[in-house]
């Protein structure tokens, strides 16, 4: 493969990853607004007001990493992939949440709930992250990217 062809492939791959990043970022924002709106309803607020933070866009954009992970995991059962994704989401949530806490800009605080760790992750969200990871896998598979 010539250097020029390698460069063009790398550039094309970067553009595709950027599209995945934006797709996942916008989708994550929408999911969070929907989730917080439902939570608002269940706590008696019938306006069903949902919310998110601008800081969350790049965090959700990282779900684009599921595409390369899926390429390695596609031979595994859905349960294994879901567990892998939920562990990955917990890991990213912990790292980014801890970083945001140090800067005093963390948009979430789980310190008031029982199954939390350091206020940045909720262990009772494991089933939610399992399903969310599989949802992002499905979403990214609906938008195939090929590098040739």
Where is each model-derived feature located?
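Polybasic, lysine-rich low-complexity intrinsically disordered segments
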Residues: 3-5
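Aromatic-rich, lipid-facing transmembrane alpha helices and their immediate juxtamembrane interface loops
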Residues: 9-148
